[in-house]
């Protein structure tokens, strides 16, 4: 009898060890892919920031894209730093740096979500009420909205850090409440508004395109593609705390979900530059143009003429 129990216990230990090895290998692969994605994202977003910040004349919509690229760059940098620190033992100094990178990462995440919500909402308003929006839109609205969103996200994430950082006055109950409030803001306000405005924009532009037999503008494609990629790739990170606290999942499943959410969110923050350049070069005869030309073409609002070109008049006055 004892021999039977010992053999069954040994088999269970071997099974658990084998399962743990598989989970460890899967996490290692996901972390490696996330690191590679972050490096590509840093290169792509740095290129967008350099082009929009120093090589191109800014338009109202390009200001949003510039700030979104900055938020994405901060996110992938913090993610890459965390992945790098996790490959070595976390001593006192590296542990503090890891905590700082984690807080900055969530800050960049909320900034990116807020900017995408503002972009999709303003594009929706400009399509639903074009004359009113053009006449009543403040000249520096884009810059003011971006600055306000950065400050609000800094405030909310600063409060979260005060209650949840293990190097400050950590309180588990208060941290849980603050996390739930922030999750409710992300999942209950920002994400639904972004989704609803994007769906409205898609239906309205699609109907107008069928009625007037015109192709949608490249800017419309850029906005919808960016929102779609965010919803598919970045929402798993937003749902992470819900999965951690409310779903009674096995520890191995939670670890795999956590690593998968880090990879998918890294892909989301790295995909936007690729979207801009793919849309900017789509149906164009001048594929050999500079990167700045391709990016400028992707951010234009004007409908395309024959050959994939756009009118040159009023380019810098039109914005989203």
From Swiss-Prot:
GO MF annotation: an example: G protein-coupled receptor activity
Glycosylated sites: 2, 6, 16
Pfam families for the chain: 7tm_1 (PF00001)
Residue intervals annotated with topology Cytoplasmic: 55-62, 134-142, 204-218, 281-320
Classification via InterPro entries: GPCR_Rhodpsn, GPCR_Rhodpsn_7TM, MRGPCRD, MRGPCRFAMILY
UniProtKB keywords: Cell membrane, G-protein coupled receptor, Glycoprotein, Membrane, Receptor, Transducer, Transmembrane, Transmembrane helix
Chain intervals for the UniProt region annotation (Disordered): 301-320
CC terms in the record's Gene Ontology section: plasma membrane
Membrane side Extracellular: residue ranges: 1-33, 84-112, 164-182, 240-257
TM stretches of this protein: 34-54, 63-83, 113-133, 143-163, 183-203, 219-239, 258-280
Membrane topology: Multi-pass membrane protein
Main localization of the protein described in the UniProt heading: membrane
Compartment annotation: Cell membrane
Ranges of Low complexity composition bias in the record: 308-320
PANTHER family reported in the protein's UniProt record: MAS-RELATED G-PROTEIN COUPLED RECEPTOR (PTHR11334), MAS-RELATED G-PROTEIN COUPLED RECEPTOR MEMBER D (PTHR11334:SF57)
Similarity field: Belongs to the G-protein coupled receptor 1 family. Mas subfamily.
Record's protein name: Mas-related G-protein coupled receptor member D
Protein source organism: Macaca fascicularis (Crab-eating macaque)
Recorded name of the encoding gene: MRGPRD
